[in-house]
């Protein structure tokens, strides 16, 4: 994301950059970018004693050798962040042309761009409940430290009054002026080249707000008087707070501040090094290839280091349905939290309609892990104010606070122990009047008092069998340990929530704790497609503990389809008429009716095969022309399987929060940072009558913005300004063309590569022109490093009207 100033053209009239302008705080770029380099040895997380000291020596040596090689080989490169605990590597700002050289340096395991993350609260609401979530625990989290990795906390809010606190030894850390005896850390993690004037401050007086609300839920002081005279309290009101501002960049789409993976990983690294007991991330983005998901991997490492990561599940269910759960909630070891209505307000708990659902779209993990209040939650906002807000952003800090309470009472518990205690002791929540499946509510509504006496700890705490084909045998062994008073014989049964003909879960009728239990699904050769999910119930007298499980029986229709090989980028034509109809639903995400894109595609399909011999930055297609009446639209799947979409990038919707067109439909589908393998581009239509001919553009590794050239800087009054725009990769997206003259919106017409900008009404003399244009790949870019808006060109110029 960086960057340097743009290129002054020969006439000294126009100025080009490869990302949005400086007025909105979006970093500029011209030929440089920030990437995350991972080195060969594992990070230090979880390594102690003599082995830990040896590992530290080895990591330090590797990093010193890498830094020396970087200086000698790429003199202009700069190390922005160093990672030792949660990753072994560094964030490096390099010329983009030098990235292949960087990959070839000795000891380099991988070079990744990372993802951009945004906040996952929904909107402020008008009614709800304050007070304190009734955890049933007597303690208040005294001495525990909760790190909030978010958009910056207003430490002056009365909910965080330092009265009665003493700064713990070794603190404050970071920018001391933004700390108190309650908020003991204040750090800001700013991408290189960011121009937003408040980016480096731990609290942004213009854009920050979300983190202050989140922190109040987790650890606001008990007995604070809120608006309307209500007495409120955080879940762990005596806990310390660490403020890690990793979201620093304003967004064009108005979704608040965004942050990128390099900075979020740096914040996780700092929180672990600072001694936080719990970290909360109420942020999210569509899942990317799990082996390349830097933030999720860093959270896994934080858990290995003994820090509890708690993450919001996301708010996309209404639009994207099952498989909408976002990264970094996809982290295997994190506690991922769904949102329910506030039981303190309603007396019962139902899942919020927006709360994202599992399985995770690419890794197919069973998430979320738990549910907590996330609807109409009263908490602090900057300026000593209070608001009710809704979102899984509000649910996660309830669990962060509960985790702090439990760790205070059980200091020897591992992260896995705490996670298992919470998941196994949850109570059922409802959705649409029925008990929610684990893919919606995880282990259920968290019950910290029951988790305090877990009895049995399961490993894994929940089980995903993934996609199972008929007739294929599989099994997963779960280890059960005594969590305190749980030793002995327990009865075992299945609590089914969703069943499918021909599939069942086979279990022994009893199990002795400590011991193991084997979960063995039976899927007959004639089994129907569908989900088999529910809970394995362990019962001993009145005591019940549960293990959530999920699988889906699949019969891929596209497995028998014929695919045409796409060997080179370029323009292609196709026609779905006369082709077979082999698939009607694509997942994951499994878009519901009325969601963001077509949910059911019942037309005939035409397939084109993309084979990658190496990982790629991206690939994709855009339909540029359809015959009259045709409603053909694209999807991208793993070869031959409509159940394996390449995540959100496979759906024809604009996914880039830095674009004003965020959320709009667009006839583009692709994959972001795909690994080597075979993929199918599928052209389908909602109905058989929507079949027809079409033309499409195909690209691979489009990481460059369009070109834009002003043909003449001096024109007569009334004569249009002409700008030549072109893109050799995915092509110009005309919906992204934005023209401003002297700061005001202006009109332009794009035809055959020339943009005609009207000068009607302009006075004679000099004027400032600003043009922004993106290509179609930009609509796929949840990966926005390097740089932010890597596939967007901005042209600014002084023009003269004669």
Locate the predicted segments by residue:
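Hydrolase catalytic cores
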Residues: 215-219, 246-247, 277, 371-434, ...
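Substrate-binding/access-modulating region of protease and related hydrolase catalytic domains
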Residues: 142, 243-333, 344, 360-365, ...
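Acidic, Ser/Thr/Pro-rich low-complexity intrinsically disordered segments
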Residues: 498, 592-655
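C-terminal edge strands of extracellular/lumenal beta-sandwich accessory domains
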Residues: 539, 552-583, 608, 635-649, ...
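C-terminal subdomain of the subtilisin-like protease fold in secreted/lumenal serine endopeptidases
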Residues: 80, 370, 408-477, 481-484, ...
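Inhibitory N-terminal propeptides of secreted protease zymogens
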Residues: 23-120
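Extracellular S/T/G-rich loop segment that most often corresponds to the catalytic His/Ser-adjacent loop
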Residues: 177-194, 329-404
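Subtilisin-like serine protease catalytic core
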Residues: 30, 134-260, 274-277, 304-306, ...
